[in-house]
Amino acid sequence: GSEMTQIEKVVDNYDGLGTIKVVKKDPVVYPNFSKTYTDEEIQSNDIIVVNETNGKSKLVSQSDMLVSEMDYQTMSQKVTTLDAEGQITAAIQSVTSANATTLYYTSGHSEQELDSTFKDVLNKSNIDTKELATESAESVPDDCNILLINGPQYDFTEAEYNVLSSYLKEGGKAMFFLYPTTTEKMTYFYKLLSDYGVNVADGYIIDSKGSYSSQYPMYLTPTMEDSDLTKDVTDTQKVVIPICKGMTVQSDVRSTLTVENMMSTTDSAYAKTNIKSQTVDKEDGDINGPFSVALSIKDSYAEKTKGTGHATEIVVFGSVSFETSTFLETNQFGNRTVLLNSLSYLAGQETTTLAIPTRSLQQESVQIQESDRIFFTVLLVVIIPLILLGSGLFIWIKRRKN
């Protein structure tokens, strides 16, 4: 089909780039060719990426490159996006990289499951994932390069806190996502952050001046601050965070600690402390902003005993909804860019790992913010017609006088 032609075009574009050479083999004519590189069954349009220098190889199957979704009108699977370039580039990076990065994600506290698109970003960034049941763990495994705490809805125990705190104190790297609407006391989880100069505000943020839609003031489009992790977000992109907790930086932090604001609300923001309230209007007990919604933390204390490069590094986002498929699967939003930069930072990657988004095979509509939609509606429906009417009236009156 047309998808197969598009895959072939993508593959042909790699031929001759640097030392890359494309060789096409018919699996019917050469049935045993693939056994040198993989034990898996090979089908037409599958791709094997081979590094002839170190012997590493990786299979990219046709099914990996064609992304399907359920068409509820026909109740059948329909190919919607092409992921050939992303999968092939990730495979090239995998077979040419010296070491893989291992990410451990905690479990046992109703953490958010890793979204399919988040998994895809990790896979394309050559980051392996493993589960860490902190309830039974005596320590964080030695091969953990990044610790992910992905929106827990229930708190950690004191014993779990001690395990995680020890890991961080020894120069660990971590990424935290908060669950904004939990009603549980998160004493030990939030203590992991307060140990590094960050306080978490109660409730979730309402910011009518910094929202994606005037109808949903809890859907934030935060301000990008001066940070290496947000600098690649373009002017045409928006980072969107639906329902988010606010954070503030403690005024007096130790000399080894640096806390950098990545994204923030406007001054008009406030935290809705009663998450069961039926109104988004400000009420008694709500907390005035502004707030940080994403922070990067670096503590150089561990470098005193373990040497350069062993600083504690944490990136924390105010909401687990930051990483959902809607905002990660295209470059239309800046969420993917910030997430990739954050992962690269924590992994200590000297060069940015490319995680190319999928290419839609369907026509995509242009997303316009609510405020822009209202502006253009007024401009086209009211202002321009009034200008034309006024101009016509002026010409008519002038001619009448003449």
Name every feature range the model reports, one short phrase each:
Residues 1-402:
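Short, surface-exposed patches at the edges or C-terminal ends of soluble domains, predominantly
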